[in-house]
């Protein structure tokens, strides 16, 4: 199973779920089953698993390290001076 950008997905990864409803969420990937890149597993958003955790569609998720790398590439990883 792989995220939108092709990175291998593993349970326990910290992810950005871009297509969560009603808004994107950051959480931990849980209960995903290898071999499926679509609606597979959940984005755990609290300290414990919940029935309200959004479904994680791998093609709509990114590993948080990749999101941080994109921000750094665009110069958005640091606060502007004077703020």
Residue ranges and their predicted role:
Residues 22-58:
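Basic/aromatic-rich interaction segments and small domains that mediate binding to polyanionic partners
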């Amino acid at each position: 199973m792989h995220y939108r950008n092709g990175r291998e997905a593993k349970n326990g990864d910290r992810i950005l779920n871009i297509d969560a409803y009603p808004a994107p969420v950051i959480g931990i990937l849980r209960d995903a089953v290898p071999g499926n890149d679509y609606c597979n597993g959940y984005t755990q958003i609290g300290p414990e698993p919940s029935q309200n955790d959004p479904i994680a569609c791998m093609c709509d998720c990114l590993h948080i390290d990749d999101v941080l790398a994109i921000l750094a590439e665009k110069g958005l990883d640091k606060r502007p001076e004077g703020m």
